[in-house]
Amino acid sequence: MELNELTITKAIVEGFFQKFSSCLETDVAIVGGGPAGLVAGYFLARAGKKVVLYERKLSLGGGMWGGGMLFNEIVVQKTALPILDLFGIRWKKYDENHYSADSIEAVSTLISQAVKAGLTVFNCISAEDVLMREDRVIGLVINWSAVEIARLHVDPLSVRSRFVIDSTGHATEIVRIVQTKVPGSLNTPSGKLEGEKSMWADKAETLTLSNTREVFPGLYVAGMSANATYGGPRMGPIFGGMLMSGQKVAEQIIRAL
């Protein structure tokens, strides 16, 4: 049978429409496709929850692809090895608490396993606002990233979810939106975004887990977003905290659903 250009177009348009329509209402919407968001999506999907992830860029993986300063190796601590083993990511021992892995294998495996577990991903889509009802986040307002980049005056669309995860990293995009729209309402010491502190890898990795929590009704933070929200330091190219934070936020939301 001859390949037909119109049939190719129909298959893409109809397939995307069906996928997008099925995700207008979900249990969880994740914003940010870095390691924390991907791991959260994996565990939520594996638990049978309807979960969607929005990533503003064309590719997922956040800063993990480049390892440290474009040296495409990453480091994780010993406590994160069970997650690497679960995903089938190979690692090498450097010393008793530092283990390295190929960043390309790590990212590509996280993406593949998360999608195969049932996570639906929409790339090139940004969240520009949240849906709010009585001081609770109940969804997202989304638009194509290209619209934002081109500065086009195009109204967005809305999607609903029972919970939202901000895993946008240093940018803390969703937390910043809520802070702007509902000043002083965050579950932080000041009621505001505390801000990211300078590099301190050991402390940052510990705080990433303790800062992974609900920061506003219906809104959770994970990964570097958690540290930036609660005033923790950055950690650099060690990713164990990111992975474990993704698992922790998934477990918290599963209990809440």
Stretches with model-predicted labels:
Residues 1-28, 143-144, 192, 197-201, ...:
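Extreme N-terminal leader/targeting segments of oxidoreductases
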Residues 19-52, 242, 250-254:
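N-terminal Rossmann-like FAD-binding beta1-loop-alpha1 element of flavoenzymes
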Residues 29-31, 54, 158-170:
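Short hydrophobic core segments
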Residues 45-65:
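Glycine-rich FAD pyrophosphate-binding loop
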Residues 66-90:
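N-terminal glycine-rich dinucleotide-binding loop that anchors FAD/FMN and/or NAD(P) in oxidoreductases
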Residues 88-163, 167:
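Feature captures the FAD/FMN-dependent oxidoreductase FAD-binding
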Residues 166-181:
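Flavin (primarily FAD) binding-site architecture
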Residues 229-257:
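A conserved FAD-binding loop/helix module that cradles the flavin
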